[in-house]
C-alpha cells in the first residue's frame, strides 16, 4: 500500500490536532497521523521546529506544502477537497462561514479551552483544577452559547441551512467539554443541544472522537 501523500504530526488527543483530522475525515482524504510525544518533548526537537517554528501541533504536510495552525489546515483541506464545507464559492455563504469561524476562534473557544484545560487536562499536567478559572470562564461561555442558541433558532447550522467548517471547527473542543459536568451548559439550550447531537452523530466526528479519550479530570454528567 502506498504511503499517503498527506501527513499530520501531533498527538490526536489534542483538540487542535483533531480539528485537522476532522477536516480530513469529512473530506475523505487518506492521511497518515505521525505520532509525537509531548511528554518526550518531540515538539521541541529541531526536526519539528523546522516544520513549525513555534513548536506547536498539528503540522500538515501535503506533498511539498507544509502548514501549521489547525484552522488554516482545515481550510486548506476543504478548499482543496470539499469546498462546499466553506460555502462552495458562493459569496454570501462563504462570508457567513467566515463570520462564524471567527466567532468560534475568538468568542467560543477561549472560555471553552480554559474550562477543558482545568477540568480535563490539569490532572495530566500534574496539578489540581483551578476552580476560580473554571467559574469565570463558565460565565463567559454561557453568554456565547446563548448567542449560538439565538442563531440556531433561525437556521439549522451556524452559517445557514448547510453544514460548514463553522460547525465542524468547534467540535473537538466541545467534545472535551461534553466530558465534564459543564456539558449541562449545552443541554440547557435546546437548539444548541440539537446542533451538537447532530455533529456528534456524524461518522467523521465519531471516528475522530475515538482518538480523544477525555474525561479523566471531571465527572461526566449523568444522563
UniProtKB/Swiss-Prot annotation:
Subunit annotation: Homodimer or heterodimer of GST-I and GST-IV (=GST-II).
EC numbers: 2.5.1.18
Positions where Blocked amino end (Ala) occurs in the chain: 2
Pfam families assigned: GST_C (PF00043), GST_N (PF02798)
Catalytic activity reported: RX + glutathione = an S-substituted glutathione + a halide anion + H(+)
GST C-terminal domain segment(s): 90-223
Superkingdom of this protein's organism: Eukaryota
Parts of the chain that traverse the membrane: none
Family: Belongs to the GST superfamily. Phi family.
Purpose of the protein: Conjugation of reduced glutathione to a wide number of exogenous and endogenous hydrophobic electrophiles. Involved in the detoxification of certain herbicides. Most active with substrates possessing a chloroacetamide structure. Trans-cinnamic acid and 1-chloro-2,4-dinitrobenzene are not effective substrates. May play an important role in the benoxacor-mediated protection of maize from metolachlor injury.
Transferase listed as a keyword: yes
Binding, glutathione: 14, 43-44, 56-57, 69-70
Identification of the protein by name: Glutathione S-transferase 4
pH-activity profile: Optimum pH is 7.5-8. Active from pH 6 to 9.
Induction / repression: By herbicides.
Keywords from the named record: Transferase
Tissue specificity note: Seedling roots.
Signal peptide from the UniProt entry: none
Amino acid at each position: 500500500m502506498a504511503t499517503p501523500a498527506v501527513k499530520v504530526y501531533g498527538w490526536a488527543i489534542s483538540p487542535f490536532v483533531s480539528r485537522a483530522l476532522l477536516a480530513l475525515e469529512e473530506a475523505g482524504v487518506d492521511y497518515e497521523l505521525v505520532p509525537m510525544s509531548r511528554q518526550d518533548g518531540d515538539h521541541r526537537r529541531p526536526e519539528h521546529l523546522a516544520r513549525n517554528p513555534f513548536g506547536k501541533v498539528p503540522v500538515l504536510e501535503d506533498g511539498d506544502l507544509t502548514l501549521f495552525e489547525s484552522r488554516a489546515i482545515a481550510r486548506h483541506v476543504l478548499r482543496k477537497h470539499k469546498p462546499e464545507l466553506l460555502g462552495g464559492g458562493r459569496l454570501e455563504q462563504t462570508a457567513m462561514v467566515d463570520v462564524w469561524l471567527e466567532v468560534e476562534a475568538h468568542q467560543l473557544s477561549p472560555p471553552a479551552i480554559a474550562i477543558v484545560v482545568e477540568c480535563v487536562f490539569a490532572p495530566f499536567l500534574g496539578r489540581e483544577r483551578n476552580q476560580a478559572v473554571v467559574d469565570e470562564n463558565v460565565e463567559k461561555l454561557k453568554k456565547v452559547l446563548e448567542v449560538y442558541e439565538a442563531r440556531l433558532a433561525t437556521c439549522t447550522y451556524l452559517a445557514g441551512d448547510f453544514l460548514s467548517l463553522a460547525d465542524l471547527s468547534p467540535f473537538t473542543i466541545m467534545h472535551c467539554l461534553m466530558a465534564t459536568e459543564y456539558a449541562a451548559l449545552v443541554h440547557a439550550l435546546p437548539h444548541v443541544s440539537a446542533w451538537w447531537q447532530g455533529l456528534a452523530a456524524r461518522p467523521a466526528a465519531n471516528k475522530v472522537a475515538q482518538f480523544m479519550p477525555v474525561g479523566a479530570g471531571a465527572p461526566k454528567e449523568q444522563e
